[in-house]
Amino acid sequence: MKVLNTFSSFSVDDVAAAKRFYGETLGLDVKDGPMGFLEIEVPGGGHVTAYPKPNHEPATFTVLNFIVPSIDDAVDELNRKGVTMEQYDFGPIKTDARGIARDEGPPIAWFKDPAGNVISVIETMAGYTA
């Protein structure tokens, strides 16, 4: 098998809300695709597809991880835009008051899109590749 490229996809229950969130809130380039899909361009030249699903159930796992130079700056910017970080305390993952997990691996914070899908911002660290 020869693989030419890859992309990921996830469902949403409101395409217009997803377009506003990924385009305006996160600042990504979002284009209307076929069949009501959204093509979301991500840094590095790739894209992900968000598609409408009438019986959408939010993903309980992280569907997108955005690598950022500073977790604190990213969380501050998202908070200013009205995005709330998730609070977790299970196994080795415990977030601080700002919603950032700093104990294991690179610092990471999770939040949800309007459809309830889990997304993260994760800080780059020397010697660690995501």
Q: Which role does the model predict for each range below?
A:
Residues 21, 71-77:
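Short amphipathic alpha-helices within nucleic acid-binding modules
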Residues 1-17, 47, 61-64, 122-130:
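N-terminal beta-strand motif that seeds the catalytic metal site of vicinal oxygen chelate
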Residues 27-32, 85-87:
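Short secondary-structure junctions
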Residues 14-15, 68-72:
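Helix N-cap motif at beta-to-alpha junctions
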Residues 17, 35-38:
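Short glycine/proline-centered loop/turn elements that form peptide/ligand docking sites
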Residues 66, 75-130:
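Vicinal oxygen chelate
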Residues 7, 35, 106:
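Short coil/loop residues immediately preceding or within conserved phosphate-binding loops
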Residues 16-29:
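Amphipathic alpha-helical segments
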